[in-house]
Every structure is written in C-alpha cells, then in structure tokens.
Amino acid sequence: MSFQHKEIEKKWQTYWLENKTFATLDNNEKQKFYALDMFPYPSGAGLHVGHPEGYTATDILSRMKRMQGYDVLHPMGWDAFGLPAEQYALDTGNDPAVFTKQNIDNFRRQIQALGFSYDWDREINTTDPEYYKWTQWIFLKLYEKGLAYVDEVPVNWCPALGTVLANEEVIDGKSERGGHPVERRPMKQWMLKITAYADRLLEDLEELDWPESIKDMQRNWIGRSEGAHVHFAIDGHDDSFTVFTTRPDTLFGATYTVLAPEHALVENITTAEQKEAVEAYIKEIQSKSDLERTDLAKTKTGVFTGAYAINPVNGEKLPIWIADYVLASYGTGAVMAVPGHDERDFEFAKTFGLPVKEVVKGGNVEEAAYTGDGEHVNSDFLNGLHKQEAIEKVIAWLEETKNGEKKVTYRLRDWLFSRQRYWGEPIPVIHWEDGTSTAVPEEELPLILPKTDEIKPSGTGESPLANIKEWVEVTDPETGKKGRRETNTMPQWAGSCWYFLRYIDPHNPDQLASPEKLEKWLPVDMYIGGAEHAVLHLLYARFWHKFLYDIGVVPTKEPFQKLYNQGMILGENNEKMSKSKGNVVNPDEIVASHGADTLRLYEMFMGPLDASIAWSESGLDGARRFLDRVWRLFIEDSGELNGKIVEGAGETLERVYHETVMKVTDHYEGLRFNTGISQLMVFINEAYKATELPKEYMEGFVKLLSPVAPHLAEELWEKLGHSGTIAYEAWPVYDETKLVDDEVEIVVQLNGKVKAKLQVPADATKEQLEQLAQADEKVKEQLEGKTIRKIIAVPGKLVNIVAN
C-alpha cells in the first residue's frame, strides 16, 4: 500500500503553520546557522520546478541544523518591484500593487505546499513601505557621504514609447516591445560611487568560501589594471586630452589617437572640411548599444576629425580620429593607438591606411601586431629595455615632465541607479527652483509611492511619476520656495541589496535592524541561488554591506560567507525550460500527482546540486516508489506498525545503520544530497532483508530522511508512538567502533586464477586463512589430483595456492 500524500502533507503543513514550528528561536545560548535563499521575483507565471531545487537544499541544511541543536534563521520574502508588473500595468491599466499581491499570494501558497521550513513571521516584501523606508534610508546615507550623485549619462531613449529602456530591453537598436527605433541620448541620472569600493571588493573576495568561477567573474567585472595616464596637447588649440594605457612603454609607437564620438572636444576640434563627415558618423552610431560598439568581431569604422594631437615623448603630430569602439563612459573616452603592438589598433590602421611602427622587437608588424615582450627599438631612451623596465622608466619620465602619471583604473563603472519607471522605490530627494537639491528628512521616511489610476510614460524621459503633479510639486513651508520631487525611482537591485539584513529584525520600526541581532546572525552561513546573479546582485549587495560596515550599521565586512550555485533543471529534451517551448513543468501538478516529498527527493537525487540536468518523469516515478517502499517497511496494509519493529538497538542492521548515519550526515553537510539519498536507499534495502527491525535504528532512519521528505517523516514519527514534531529531535550520531567489519571477503586463487570467494573473520591469521581456503568445497574440487607446492596468504585480501 502506498501512503496518501495529499492527506499527510496537508495535515503536517497545517500543523507547522498553526504551531509556528519553524519560528526562529533567537536563543543566544545556541550556535547560529543562517541559511538564505535568493528570494524570488513573484511573476505572474508562478513557481516552476527550478525554484525548489535551491530551496530544498537550504531546507535540508536548516532542518538538519535544528536537529543538531543550532538556532536556525531560514526566511523567505519577495523581490517584488520590477519591470513585468509595470508593463502589466501599462498594458491593462490595473494597479501593479494589486497584481503583485496576487502573485505573492500564489507564490506563498506554492512554496508552503512544498513543506519548506521557513519562519513566515519574518516574511518581507520589497514593495512594502515599512521595508523600503530602510532602502530609502540607506540611499540617504550614501547621499550624505557623497556616494550618490547626479551625472549626465547616455541612455537608451525610445521616442515612440516615450521612455528610457534598460540595455536588456534593446535588441539590434530597436525596443524589445514593439520594435521601435531606440537612440542614445544623454540624460541626468543618479549614480552610486561603487568605484570607491573597487579595491576592497576585489581584495576581500579572498576571504570568501565561494566558487572560484564566481570570484573570477567578479574580478573580471571589477577589472583592475595598472598603467599610466598620458596627456596629449592638441595642435593649434589650448585644449588637451588624457588617455589611459597599460603599455606606456610603447608611446614611441603611437601613430594616431581616437576619441569617443561623444567626447566633449570633438565639436570644438573638428575642421570645417571634416565637419559633415563627423556629424554624419555621430548620427549613424546613435542607436548602437555599448555592447554592439565594442564587439571585437565587427568591422572597424571611424572618421578623421582633421585635428592633430602632439605626442609628448617626441613631439610628433598624430591624427585624431573618432570611432564607435571608444566609449565616452569608459576610461577617459580617448585612446592612443599603437598599431604595431595592439590587435584592435592594427586592424583599424589597416582599414584606414594609417602608419604602423615597430617599437618592440619580436614579430613582423607589417603582417600582425606583436603583443609580446621584447627589446625596445626606435624608442630613444627606452631602447634595449624590456617591457617592465621600460614601463617604469617612461612613467618616471612622464611624471618628471608633467606629461602624465602612474594610474590604476577599473573596468567597473559607477552604478547607474535611477530608472524612469513608476514601479520602484521613490528616490527621497527634492530639487528646488534655485538649482539646489536636498534630501527628504529622515523622519519623513518612507516617502511613499503615490497611487495613480494612470501609469503611462511621461513622454519627456522622466518616469510616469512626473504625471502626478500633486505629488511632484512641493513648497518649502519655511521659505515658500518651490521644488519638484525626484521622479526617477530606484532599480530592482536596490531592495535585494540588503534584504538579508531585514530578515534578522523584520518588524523593527526604529532601526534597519538591532545591532545585537546583526551581531548574532551575520554573516549569512549559506547562500544558495542561481549563477545568473554572479556579478550584479552579489557585487551590489557586497558594496552596500561594506558601506553599512563603514558607517557602523553592520558588524561584518562581508555579507555572505559561503555561496553555492545550484544547476539548472532542463526540459526532458535537455533544452532550457521556457513557455515558448512548452516544456515548463509546474510544481503544483507534481505535488498533486506524486506529492511534495517526492518532488523534493527527486530534485535532490537527480545528480550533483551544481549540475544542469534534464527533468525525467521516470526519475520522478522512481523517487515516489522509494518513498512507498519506506512507508511499507514501517506500516502494514492494516495501517498498523510493522510487527518486525522491536524495541532497542540489537545487532541486526547495526553496521549499516551507523554507516548510514555517518555518510548521510557527511553528504548533507557537503551538499552532496544525491549520494546521501543513495545511502538511505542502501539502508532500506538491507532493512527489507532483515528478520527484525530494531526501533532505535528505524527511528534514526526517519530522522535522517526528515530533512528531505519531512511530511512522510513526521507521519512515521507519529506512528512510531511520538507526539508532536520531529523537527527538534536530536540528530543521530554514529559509533565508529560499529563501522569495523567483523568479516571480510577474500579471494582464493589457484595458480593466480580466482576460483572462490570466502567470508572470513577480519582478524584471521595467515595460518587460519590457509586452512579455511583448503577446507572450501570448490577449492577441494579444483585441487583433486594435484600437489600443493606453495600457499601465499595475505590477510584481509587473498590466498593463492600454487599446485600442479
């Protein structure tokens, strides 16, 4: 008989909620364990089977740690601001708050149906004013410290939609929605100075227990490079520009320079003859994204401005070009070109017939750029030197002559923090008519997002909030000065930068969280989520955390001590699950047909947690069959406990039980859930062969199963005669002495060929092994008519009889 999963799961889910079984104890006597999931965006589509993979992993750890005596913090919440809800509101005219609440209710229902041991009293929602009050408070602190500032930044402006689009919403120069043309246009935007933390974000990665691949992605994103700034005067002008180069030693090889088309100097230095060509080129590249412009594979384009720069090292005139591969937002927006020793410069020079000079020996620069090390030539005071010495010498010369200086730069840009959207946290700043700006006073937070019947683009590039005049227009009660509220909102990243801190003290009206509680719970012990957040979310969260550390709010430099990325669950055809492919598996259907415990067990048993694996219905059926076998081992068809279960421990199953406790504990701790479950299966197979089932071992098994299949385990625990929940029962421990084999298997060989296998006492001596081998019936048969010449016995391994 199989167990009735619908009844059992409903029964225990109701019990856990009513009894607040998983409420965090906040008990300072106990060691803490903080297990965190990347909280989901509550989409209209609901949960898919990929979500529970990571959630089950943290749940197994949380349940085990509670049983091991830890005080466990295991919370869940909603990253609920964001574009889809706004888009829904634009399309339907409905309030995104209503849509978001429906989605959250659905997500919560689905998550509770999977039996995760979350403390629901700590549930948070980034769109709740009591939550985003503190998101706004952090912004004010950044603003006070000069880390939030306004700058003119090129953005993706779509005239037809009357709005600014994120890079992800632009495909081949057109809007993803409706395919309207998109152009780059400078606009005032809020920026956060993450670059001020670049070195610390880089250095502190060393202290984290994170996958090396994720650390590398962050290192590359930060992109620290050492080199020099070189100043170039412009011939016939008072202006000059600066370039950054990692190879200042090749300065003698520069044959032209390139400015970004948006560079402030372009208009001023372009000659009358080149004006038309330059303006046409700038217009042509306006719709290109930064990614398209810097694509290494594309054909190089550019236009000569007619102006020349002076090479500071030798006074040579170098033509100044503009080209789209140089970005105004990156570095200084200007580069010196050394085509003999840089591949991109070489390609550009060949395309436009510009000269190529050799200044480092080692290749044939007429055919290809030589980027390796070598002796410097045609380089005056650098001749004969190799790369490192030449770099040091030329930097010393640049600094001495005031033509440049040593410089460290980063690929990391400051974080563009404003969005021209309605559905986000309002930025608490007021711009006054006299040109000044002030922050909304702390005591007036939260600055609540106003309700509106009409969420539509403003048409000016401002957010839809600009349409709500009564909210936007303010008057200073003291001076009568008129002002306008900031109409940009924060990006979705803002709420997820610090949510793990609010879980620690979610209802505190006076502080982001109490210092004592932060001291107790930080850092997060285990953070599990998808690798797609490897860079942005994790980098932004680390930045905010370091800032909060600097102002004394949090006690740790880093938020997440251990990070783990679960793999992806693919469709049965090994393709990514997506609505368009029609291969999405809905967990609701699996919970109805197979049960939540089966889904949890199957997702953990599919393979290693970090691997991407295809969904398989037969695998799901196999997981259910195992749980049915467990049920039938304990419960007779009559519903009574199996009569073979006897009080106490006893020798039956002793060794396999202790081995199971050891392996399952070790595998769960190491997130190797698939091998932990395999060992549970080994135990069940052995138990089916046994004539009696010692109760102590059967109860221990139920405890080991409970983190993976908690509903079934609770029901079996009750059937074994216990009242209340298994959740805080002591985790089993193993006895090492019980793991030693009393017997071992040895092979018996005749003239080197295996003839028999014997079970012998583990401590049998050579003499005993010789006697046991010769006494075996099979061996006797083989020896008939032969004379034994020699016997070699190796205790614990083999006996080899030489006979003829």
Curated annotation (Swiss-Prot):
Catalytic reaction equation(s): tRNA(Leu) + L-leucine + ATP = L-leucyl-tRNA(Leu) + AMP + diphosphate
InterPro entries: aa-tRNA-synth_I_CS (IPR001412), aa-tRNA-synth_Ia (IPR002300), Leu-tRNA-ligase (IPR002302), Leu_tRNA-synth_edit (IPR025709), M/V/L/I-tRNA-synth_anticd-bd (IPR013155), Methionyl/Leucyl_tRNA_Synth (IPR015413), Rossmann-like_a/b/a_fold (IPR014729), tRNAsynth_Ia_anticodon-bd (IPR009080)
Short name of one Pfam family: tRNA-synt_1_2
Compartments reported by the entry: Cytoplasm
A Gene Ontology BP annotation from the UniProt entry: leucyl-tRNA aminoacylation
Residues reported to bind ATP: 579
Molecular function per GO: aminoacyl-tRNA deacylase activity; ATP binding; leucine-tRNA ligase activity
GO cellular component: a single term: cytosol
Enzyme Commission code(s) on record: 6.1.1.4
Keywords for this protein: Aminoacyl-tRNA synthetase, ATP-binding, Cytoplasm, Ligase, Nucleotide-binding, Protein biosynthesis
Major subcellular site: cytoplasm
Domain of life: Bacteria
Motif ('HIGH' region): 40-51
Enzyme category, top tier: ligase
Motif ('KMSKS' region): 576-580
UniProt record similarity statement: Belongs to the class-I aminoacyl-tRNA synthetase family.
Annotated protein name in UniProt: Leucine--tRNA ligase
Native species: Bacillus subtilis (strain 168)
